[in-house]
Amino acid sequence: MKIALNFKPKQSAKKLLLALQERSRDIIIKRYGLGKSANRMTLDAIGKAYGITRERVRQIENHAINTIRKSKNYTEEKATFDELEKIISSMGGIVVEQELLDAISRDSATQSCLNFILVIGHPFNKMKEDEDFKYRWFIDNHLAEKIQGSLKKLYENLKDDQLVIEPEMIKTFLSYIEDVSEQYRTEEIAKRWLNLS
C-alpha cells in the first residue's frame, strides 16, 4: 500500500520547527532525527552534547512541543494534520507505526519528519511497544482499547498447539468487534489489526 500525500513532510516539519528558539530547535532536530542524518539521538547523548542532564533535555523537549502547538505555524499546518488523521482512519483508526510510515514513504528522513508531525499533532496518540503489541498510532482511544482488548481475547482463546487458518482467525476476530463501526469491519483492516500484536 502506497499513500500519496498532498503535503511535503520535510517542509511541514521545518515550518513547525521555526516556532522554536535555536537551542530548543536543535534539541528537537537531534531527538527526532530531523537533521542531515535521520538518526535519532537519545536524551542522554543530547544531554552530554549540551552538558545538561537527561531530565533537562526532556523538559526542553516537552516545552518545545508545547511551544510549537501554540504557534501560528501549527495552526497553518491544520491541513497536514487533517490529512494524516484521514490516513490513519482509512487504515483502521489504529495502526502499527512502521506500517503507517512505510505506507507513506520508505525514506528514513521522511519517516522521521512524519513521526515528528504525528508527535506534535492533535489528535494523534502513540502507544509504546509492550509484550502484547507493537508501537502503534491511533486517533480514537475507545476504538484502540476495543481492538486491543479483542485481540487479547482472541489470542487467549487460541491453544498453543492450535493451527488456525487466516480466514477463520479473521472471522473469529470480527465476531469480537461487532459493535465497531461498519467502515472498519473489512478483511483488509482486520488483517492490519491482527498485525498489531
Q: Can you say where each PLM-predicted feature lies in the sequence?
A:
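C-terminal non-catalytic scaffold/interaction domains in large multidomain proteins
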Residues: 1-197
